[in-house]
Amino acid sequence: MLFLPLVIRDSYKIMIRILHTADWHLGQTFFGYDRTEEHGVFLNWLAEEIRQKEIDALIIAGDVFDVSNPSAASQSMYYQFIYRVTAENPYLQIVIVAGNHDSAARLEAPLPLLQAMRTEVRGVVRKLEGG
């Protein structure tokens, strides 16, 4: 976990708490073993860490899912987690970046809904206008 001091004014500082995660691989099976229960335990632990440590920003740096076309159950687990932690932590912001196991377009598809929950997703690298 990274604690980053940010100077707002010369005499006023705040601390921003950033929690960086990656490689969740929701929906993964390991040699035929379904890891759904493990993923649920992890997400519950993560939600509790966010609450207890008053995290300001959660970064999910790729491989949210194990495959580019995840099951409905895996997607449901993902969206329920985002809804839960943003509802329980009104100042939390989430940034998600697609990894090589993720479908960038699939992660970005519900962007307007995710933005309503203070969540930004970047899956596709876009070229700047004029350059």
Model features per residue range: what roles?
Residues 11-16, 85-92, 102, 107-131:
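Binuclear metal-dependent hydrolase catalytic cores
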Residues 31, 64-82, 98-117, 123:
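Metal-dependent catalytic neighborhoods of phosphoester/phosphodiester hydrolases
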Residues 3-82, 90-91:
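N-terminal active-site segment of His-dependent metallophosphoesterases
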Residues 53-58, 93-99, 130-131:
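Low-complexity, flexible helical/coil segments
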